[in-house]
Amino acid sequence: MNDSTFTLGIVGARGHTGAELIKLVAAHPRLQLAFVSSRERAGQRLADHHPEFQGELRYENLDADAVAAKGVDAVILALPNGLAAPFVAALEAAKPDTVIVDLSADYRFDNAWYYGLPELTRGRYNGQKHISNPGCYATAMQLAIYPLLDLLAGPPQCFGVSGYSGAGTTPSDKNNVELLADNLMPYALTNHVHEREVSVQMGVAVEFMPHVAPHFRGITLTANLWLNRVQTREQIVERFQQAYAGEPLIEVVDEAPWVSRIAGRHGAQVGGFTLAPGGKRVVVVATLDNLLKGAASQAMQNLNLALGIDELTSIPH
């Protein structure tokens, strides 16, 4: 068995997702963390922020050329939307076979990139070095819709609620705990980037209404699905069980899942499966941790896949 190690760098390591990535890398037997880039923490020891990581590695403030000059096997870009392109260009120029996993939305609509939602798109992976990690809401939406895709009679309506960690670390109303107290904040109620993302990936128009809640982490996604023919609940449940059979990170549950039960866990739960009278409308609920299956854990699945390592290495399941 080949047990060679691979070198990895993380750009955007200060954020919530970067922190989860560092934990996963620290537990990975075949990844060596070569650098972590964070403008705000430059010079600080990684171990002082992440006790699970041993060693003297320090945060650096690296621009695109400096990242490319490191010559690592793989780079994870955990940056806000719109910032990935210079890093991608520099890495392509310096070492074209570098595996790049981008967590932003920047390349989710680029057919030259593999769209990495492994449970749904694993069959499309064909050695691509550039991987676009799906959005957190987008992952939950697709898991709720996919098993019924051929039965849809119209656009799925998806009501999403996320913990405020999804708003990142840059201060805003959507991560202000005082403003969020006893509150629910609707935002981007049409044309959210994840609405567009899922519409492209599923090949069907999706209507998505996101909200931010006072809890820190975890997404609840409630999908209202109109069907083109009558179904029983048993038929619906069987479709989901068949779709996710053999997928350790996707759990099909009978009752509607609670976000409090998925926070801190690396997979997703899908359940509820409530049919309206007449059998042509069903409501499905999906929950996942937006920082894990919605970001870091999924990125690790994709990185493992690209490096030829067992997909779930370092991911508790």
From Swiss-Prot:
<keyword id="KW-0560">Oxidoreductase</keyword>
<dbReference type="Pfam" id="PF01118">
    <property type="entry name" value="Semialdhyde_dh"/>
</dbReference>
<dbReference type="InterPro" id="IPR023013">
    <property type="entry name" value="AGPR_AS"/>
</dbReference>
<feature type="active site">
    <location>
        <position position="136"/>
    </location>
</feature>
<dbReference type="GO" id="GO:0006526">
    <property type="term" value="P:L-arginine biosynthetic process"/>
</dbReference>
<protein>
    <recommendedName>
        <fullName>N-acetyl-gamma-glutamyl-phosphate reductase</fullName>
        <ecNumber>1.2.1.38</ecNumber>
    </recommendedName>
</protein>
<keyword id="KW-0521">NADP</keyword>
<dbReference type="Pfam" id="PF22698">
    <property type="entry name" value="Semialdhyde_dhC_1"/>
</dbReference>
<comment type="similarity">
    <text>Belongs to the NAGSA dehydrogenase family. Type 1 subfamily.</text>
</comment>
<keyword id="KW-0963">Cytoplasm</keyword>
<dbReference type="GO" id="GO:0051287">
    <property type="term" value="F:NAD binding"/>
</dbReference>
<comment type="pathway">
    <text>Amino-acid biosynthesis; L-arginine biosynthesis; N(2)-acetyl-L-ornithine from L-glutamate: step 3/4.</text>
</comment>
<dbReference type="InterPro" id="IPR000534">
    <property type="entry name" value="Semialdehyde_DH_NAD-bd"/>
</dbReference>
<dbReference type="InterPro" id="IPR036291">
    <property type="entry name" value="NAD(P)-bd_dom_sf"/>
</dbReference>
<comment type="function">
    <text>Catalyzes the NADPH-dependent reduction of N-acetyl-5-glutamyl phosphate to yield N-acetyl-L-glutamate 5-semialdehyde.</text>
</comment>
<keyword id="KW-0028">Amino-acid biosynthesis</keyword>
<dbReference type="GO" id="GO:0003942">
    <property type="term" value="F:N-acetyl-gamma-glutamyl-phosphate reductase activity"/>
</dbReference>
<keyword id="KW-0055">Arginine biosynthesis</keyword>
<dbReference type="GO" id="GO:0005737">
    <property type="term" value="C:cytoplasm"/>
</dbReference>
<dbReference type="InterPro" id="IPR050085">
    <property type="entry name" value="NAGSA_dehydrogenase"/>
</dbReference>
<dbReference type="InterPro" id="IPR000706">
    <property type="entry name" value="AGPR_type-1"/>
</dbReference>
<dbReference type="GO" id="GO:0070401">
    <property type="term" value="F:NADP+ binding"/>
</dbReference>
